[in-house]
Amino acid sequence: AGGAHRLVLSAGHTVPLVYATLAVFDEAMRARLAREGDPAFAFPDGGRWALTWEHLLDLRRNGGLPGHAEMAGRTLLLKWNTGPSGHGMPPSVGEALALRAAGCEDVKVFAIEGEGGLTPGASHETRNSAWGLGLSNLVFLLDWNDFGIDDNPVSSVVHGDPASWFAPYGWRITGTTEGSSFPEVTRAVLEAARGENPGRVPSLAWFKTRKGRGYGTYDNKSHGTPHPLNSEKFWTTRKAFMARYGVAY
């Protein structure tokens, strides 16, 4: 839809989280349809474009869901093919500029990235160009957890914090040190997207998080490290989930 906000998952390797969210949404729709029988909860075209839990079983397999974000098939909501760090930052500027040129400046472009994605040179050009073009419809959402895949924290090689990374380029800044608090995240996102912006400049919302939270393996060690099936950590993470949501494995 022309008025729908755009999502660029610049941190494209995190796309399994999008898949999981869409699968949960599909389950919720199925449950409402079964309980109430209201066709409003049925997906059009027989669910041709829906992403279900069954699709998760083929993640990163031939013909299954790709491991990086792709604007295709069941993930057309993602407005760029992304994967490498920072890859989606320049096109997010292009998307915001195109929307403004089309008279749709009220449509926001949300780009999600981690601080590691700010290290490529193109990210600096992106931040400067977004301000220079006055892209008030561009909102960056930054996951600030101080780790990528390396043993050394990002802060050991990159100086500063989100404010010092974006304020010199003229951006509006908001954020929270409680990046795992839903109310705090919501507040920061709404402030970035809907807050007063008299200078009509791009906005940043940052979230301080802990990489690996709730997984039992933290920081860079959590990256691409699935727990062995039926191991102690495998069941520890599931027990916490079962206790909170009342489900059983």
Q: What does each model-identified segment do?
A:
Residues A1-L133:
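Cofactor-binding active-site loop characterized by glycine-rich and histidine/acidic residues
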Residues R74-Y249:
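Glycine-rich ThDP/TPP pyrophosphate-binding loop and its adjacent helix/strand module
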